[in-house]
Amino acid sequence: MKTLKTLKIFIIVFIASVSLASFAGFGESCSSLPTTSDGYLETDTAYGYIIRNIDMKDPRGNCNSVASSITFCFKNVEGSSSPCTMYTLNEGDSKKISDLSTDNNPDLGANPVLKNIVLTVKKWDNDLCLVMPTSRGPMPVACKSLSATPTPPPSEDKNCNIGKSCYTGANYSQSLINFSGLAVQCLSETLNKIFFAGKSCSAQDQNSRITNLAAFSTFQGYLKRIIGAALILYTMFFAFNMALNTEYASTEKIALFVIKFLFVAYFSIGLGPLDFSGGQPTKENGMLKYGLPLLTGAAPDFAQMIFNAAGSRGLCQFDNSKYKDGYKFYGLWDAIDCRIGYYLGLDLLYNIDKNRVLGNVVGNGPRGNNTPIPNFDPEGKNDRPKDLSKAGALRFFTVMFGFFMAGNVIILAAGLVFSVIFLSILLYFITHYLVCMITIYVMTYISPIFIPMALFTRTKAYFDGWLKVCISCALQPAVVAGFIALLITMYDSAIFKNCEFLRYDYERGDIRFSTFELRLPVGGADKCQESFGYKMLEYYAGKGWEEHLLILFPIKSIVRDVVSILAELLCVLVFSVIFYYFSKSIGRFASDLTNGPNMDAVTASPTKIVGLVKKGAAFLKDAAMASQGKPLVGDKPGVGGKRKEGEQQGGDLASGSGGGK
């Protein structure tokens, strides 16, 4: 009997053990899981507890390496009909533990600490794993091997060092001619990738010619110990002062100590981890979260605020509400690009939809006369040059050539000088803004070096200098923008006088743009018709051109309103020369006003550009004289000979006086 009972107990224990092994081999994975060196996650956190409640080695073929899904058995509550419930999740699927514990297991799905943990299926090296967030980053709780090494997905950002807006930035502009806003956005995104993104190009990319700097977080890590030592020294010095002087124990001193301590820690190495998004602990750095956006955003905001107060009524004034979020700064640069195109006679900005092929438009602005002025499709269009009919042509230079063919060289010279000075001043503003933006990014990148210097009296001057440069670079573009706004106001008043402009807004998918149509004001229409800008638009339309025969070749020139055009253009030229000479000191004025560095040495100043134009003109003149066999100006006896003779006499006198000593 005893033998029979013993055998019976043995059979029951064997069956129970086999069933437990078959249906509840919890904590087993098809592939080995990574382990931590101290075993902390596996023993003392929810990570190890969840591993011990998952079974993968079930007799149902869960370890199949061909399937692109993962199957596992999740433990049920004690006393359930089945020890666990099977689940199959595809790659990329995510489930909360509360969704997997269908029977409200109080140890899992109903546990307030565990129920909101998200399990995600993703590739982990050569395995497909069920991953959960931990304090040390995402970690797998169950894995299986794949049949072959997966091919890495192609990177979405093929141009890893170049901002995406360098290729798509034109879609955010409302001006049909846009290059300055595109340059600003392209440079901003590229600097952000180089300094802060922390994603370098693949080592196999042989076409890459730009090497990323270490990411800002990596750079912070290098200085973490140094900054920590500075904070410890600061605390020790303050404690010594409190022990030796009771005045340091006051509430004011203690509050100032705490504020400076937190300021340096938050803006230099960051506080945290404050965010566990995706299980990855991240630090919150005040310089990246508040400092950089504030400094880079202040420059265009101040500049646009001043710039929008200038200009003619309705000309190149875009609707700011139609810019996408994060791209409203394009309004400033669109206004500049639009005026460049409008002053130089770009047809696209004026009559883009004369055949109404774009559908409905919305007109905004003062309407005045309801007839478009002038008519861009005159009956005598055969008299005008063919260049005026080309889309996208800069008609200003075609009209200047028409005056030249009529013998009006002074008008041609005045027009070319105006265009060179106007473009050089605007180019100076653009380059000045870009240099200031680059400086702000560099100052932000090296901020972990200078911010801790605010703790000590002997090093605070370095911090003050760093802060001074940052604030100055944020304000200098606003000062230069005020100068440009005044220039634009004077140009609009001199060129278009009291003319008004009607804006037409177009939308084609995600692309939005506007054109501007000149309209006569209700009162004082004669003054607008006598303006230089109105007459130039008539020339662009083909009015005022005459055809003549020069020997055997027909030429087209402009002989109408020559005197009035010359007077108006000379008035514009006077303003241009005044602003040209004033632009020589605007950079120094902006630096003195903001108490920062002078950027003229690294910008395209108008004087440099005009100097290059002068050198080019002198070179062409010398080349023309040399081709005709004439002596150059410096080789003439009446000029160069006297100068050389005087130099020789001066040298003889100097040598004679030296010998007499």
UniProtKB/Swiss-Prot annotation:
GO BP annotations, alphabetical order: protein secretion by the type IV secretion system
Signal sequence extent: 1-24
Topology relative to the membrane: Multi-pass membrane protein
Keywords: Cell membrane, Membrane, Signal, Transmembrane, Transmembrane helix
Highest taxon of the lineage: Bacteria
Regions that span the bilayer: 226-246, 254-274, 410-430, 436-456, 469-489, 562-582
Subcellular location: Cell membrane
One GO location term (cellular component): plasma membrane
The keyword Transmembrane is annotated on this UniProt entry: yes
Region Disordered, residue ranges: 629-661
Name of a matching Pfam family: TrbL
Family: Belongs to the TrbL/VirB6 family.
Protein name (database record): Uncharacterized protein RC0143
